[in-house]
Amino acid sequence: MAAEEKDPLSYFAAYGSSSSGSSDEEDNSEPEETSRKGQDTAKSAGGYGNKAEKRLPGPDELFRSVTRPAFLYNPLNKQIDWERHVVKAPEEPPKEFKIWKSHYVPPPETYSTEKKPPPPELDMAIKWSNIYEDNGDDAPQNAKKARLLPEGEETVESDDEKDEHTSKKRKIELGEPTKKKK
């Protein structure tokens, strides 16, 4: 009972002291000394020496005495007027719709894709001769240069034509591998 009458905070005040004792008697004496010092200072400071005034009421007693806050009390109506305490937010004016400014491309009228015809077919003989660089005597030639001459007449070739014909020929050494065009 003597321990219950002590100031409840004195235990924590004594617990933080720098001196540490190993026996129970020393531990019990420290809180008593600090509680006595606290009482002396309390009496001299304000005269609050009565422990009953310092004590807070228990939870059951507290909730029995306080049923609702004093600012909600209305002695005439005896009911809480919640509408008086409601705070409403200010109303915002409706926002006008504005079209975004952008440089977009409008969608096409129709979503069908145009069908392209397949490319014209190439003569496979010309294609294969170009791939394998087979420009020999048996390589296919364009039909535009073919013309028949009457017998006895010979064609006179200009210098430009001779240069073209010789530029197509090249020497290939036996040690070099042939290079393919891609």
UniProtKB/Swiss-Prot annotation:
It comes from the Eukaryota. Residues 23-32, 151-162 have a biased composition (Acidic residues). The modification Phosphotyrosine is found at Y132. Residues 51-61, 172-182 have a biased composition (Basic and acidic residues). It holds the Pfam family DUF4660. The modification Phosphothreonine is found at T67. Disulfide bonds: none annotated. PANTHER family: UPF0690 PROTEIN C1ORF52. This is UPF0690 protein C1orf52 homolog.
